Amino acid sequence: METGFPAIMYPGSFIGGWGEEYLSWEGPGLPDFVFQQQPVESEAMHCSNPKSGVVLATVARGPDACQILTRAPLGQDPPQRTVLGLLTANGQYRRTCGQGITRIRCYSGSENAFPPAGKKALPDCGVQEPPKQGFDIYMDELEQGDRDSCSVREGMAFEDVYEVDTGTLKSDLHFLLDFNTVSPMLVDSSLLSQSEDISSLGTDVINVTEYAEEIYQYLREAEIRHRPKAHYMKKQPDITEGMRTILVDWLVEVGEEYKLRAETLYLAVNFLDRFLSCMSVLRGKLQLVGTAAMLLASKYEEIYPPEVDEFVYITDDTYTKRQLLKMEHLLLKVLAFDLTVPTTNQFLLQYLRRQGVCVRTENLAKYVAELSLLEADPFLKYLPSLIAAAAFCLANYTVNKHFWPETLAAFTGYSLSEIVPCLSELHKAYLDIPHRPQQAIREKYKASKYLCVSLMEPPAVLLLQ
């Protein structure tokens, strides 16, 4: 190795120690397959990608093994892609602002609105036949509500037949295509005037306010059917609350790297918690579960989700494409393909539409709501609708010195006294976040598009009387 290069460890993706023995699992209706941890090849140091000045150093196995991410100050062009943070049992080390490191947006369009163009797929890694499975399952006695939620829903037959006015369709098509008599500019201006007429109707057409209460009641019923177990971590033999916090913080970075929607993050965390509620996972595979949950959520929510190779890359190829796809398959099996779940984000958006607030209050409510994702305890014991109400109250009090308006109390059925326990927990998380090592959410909301709401001083106390 050249002496001009410092030893640099590219980020790996293991949470915890090395060389764990994986538990096997066999369950009814689930595939009998295994996953294999990628071993460290040697203790020697390698030079990787000398043009970018990055050195890949491997370390010996051991309980005290740790990895550090830095960059050599050689002045060469930065690498074309950015590998996200390293997950370990002791903490997360990642590239930070202020070290002269530029985060590179790879391939995705603005707000994930355009399909990737000119992408080069990463080469598939060879997969060896793994010996044992990395999961163990425990089955709790299902309650009657759980049995009902897992039953197969029969499809509904559409008995109503709607007639199509073909004359109108033909006239519209003739209007758009008859360029001999109408110039393209006139067509564009006509379409523009039509869109202005539609927009003049306001947001009631889109928000279907006449059905808002029915939609809300349906979501309130659905959130009970799809909530994870509040204290599932007590049954996990090899992972802890801290490891889950590190994983969720990393998922926030993944969402920012690929400019995914906020709802995608909430769905991924819901899938993760529901999976861990009935499956025990070893720490070496926890990030694989989280990555598969994010992949599945992005497929469900995004117009142009990142490709599988992108998710393999962000784990620094710790897991192969085949492993990730198999984990996605297992995740769908465990979730019974039930992916349409109400989240805190959905309820919060309903509250914000129902009760108009300023943009700063809206962004602050979204910020404190995302903070609830970091901690399974205590927030999993609260329903998403209640967490959203607490986030609204906390943001409204911070900016406007008011808590819970009467309009939302009537709409949601929640009184302020019912919100107070969750509000107190959320306020505590709001006060503690500047001192925590997991800063991805706080860094996200430091951006100007969110009006830098994470830099606002939280209220020291909540005057609830």
UniProtKB/Swiss-Prot annotation:
Function per UniProt: May be involved in the control of the cell cycle at the G1/S (start) and G2/M (mitosis) transitions. May primarily function in the control of the germline meiotic cell cycle and additionally in the control of mitotic cell cycle in some somatic cells.
Pfam families: Cyclin_C, Cyclin_N, Cyclin_N2
SUPFAM superfamilies from the UniProt entry: Cyclin-like
Tissues/organs with expression: Very high levels in testis and very low levels in brain. Also found in myeloid leukemia cell lines.
InterPro entries the record matches: Cyclin, Cyclin-A_N, Cyclin-like_dom, Cyclin-like_sf, Cyclin_C-dom, Cyclin_N, Cyclins_cyclin-box
Statement: the UniProt record of this protein carries the keyword Cell cycle: yes
Identification of the protein by name: Cyclin-A1
Compartments where found: Nucleus
Quaternary structure note: Interacts with the CDK2 and the CDC2 protein kinases to form a serine/threonine kinase holoenzyme complex. The cyclin subunit imparts substrate specificity to the complex. Does not bind CDK4 and CDK5 (in vitro). The cyclin A1-CDK2 complex interacts with transcription factor E2F-1 and RB proteins. Found in a complex with CDK2, CABLES1 and CCNE1. Interacts with INCA1. Interacts with KLHDC9.
The species this protein was found in: Homo sapiens (Human)
Superkingdom of the source species: Eukaryota
SMART domains reported in the protein's UniProt record: CYCLIN (SM00385), Cyclin_C (SM01332)
Mod. after translation: Polyubiquitinated via 'Lys-11'-linked ubiquitin by the anaphase-promoting complex (APC/C), leading to its degradation by the proteasome. Deubiquitinated and stabilized by USP37 enables entry into S phase. Ubiquitinated during the G1 phase by the SCF(FBXO31) complex, leading to its proteasomal degradation.
Family to which this protein belongs: Belongs to the cyclin family. Cyclin AB subfamily.
First-listed, main subcellular location of the protein, grouped into a coarse class: nucleus
